[in-house]
Amino acid sequence: FETKLLLNSKYDQTVNEIIKFTKNRERSDNLLIYYAGHGELEKDENRGYWLPVDAGATQDAKWLANDRIKNWIKSSKAKHIIVIADSCFSGMLMRGTGGQDKSIEKLTKASLEKYQLKKTRIVFTSGGVEPVMDSDGGDHSLFADQLIRTLRNNNKVMLSYALFREVKNYVEEYS
């Protein structure tokens, strides 16, 4: 597998890497995109954004619209894509995509097996359409802390819905 770590990335670098990783995939590929950073909501437009380090305080050309991210993800040839977004207003990422709204809790084993055969897009977010807790006093957000803890303590194959449920339950309990 290939890994690309972007720390404190600027708009152009972020966009170029997302495009590279979503466009240059084959049908057998799986892709994980993890974003931890600032997010914003443009209330008048009802649009969510990721804010790279060079983004201005008010909406500008350096705000990365969730719509663009959604389009890159939808058009990718990759079989499975998981996006984990730990930012304020991250719940806007998959709103209005036109896809089926499948709550993780409603999925059965049979439907999960069916999804394994199809092209899937899964988004885990640290919250809905609101600000999220930045830190619980540690080095990471409450969401990231539990995500890391769950992955480290797991010693077998973990389905995405189980990871989501574990992190979600913890965050709801402690936020």
Where are these regions (language model features)?
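Residue-level recognition of the N-termini of beta-strands and the immediately preceding loop/turn
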Residues: F1, D29-L31, R121
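Caspase-like (clan CD) cysteine peptidase catalytic core
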Residues: S9-A36, E40-G98, N155-E166
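Active-site-proximal C-terminal subdomain of hydrolase catalytic domains
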Residues: T3, I81-S175
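A structural preference for short, hydrophobic beta-strand core positions in alpha/beta folds
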Residues: L5-L7
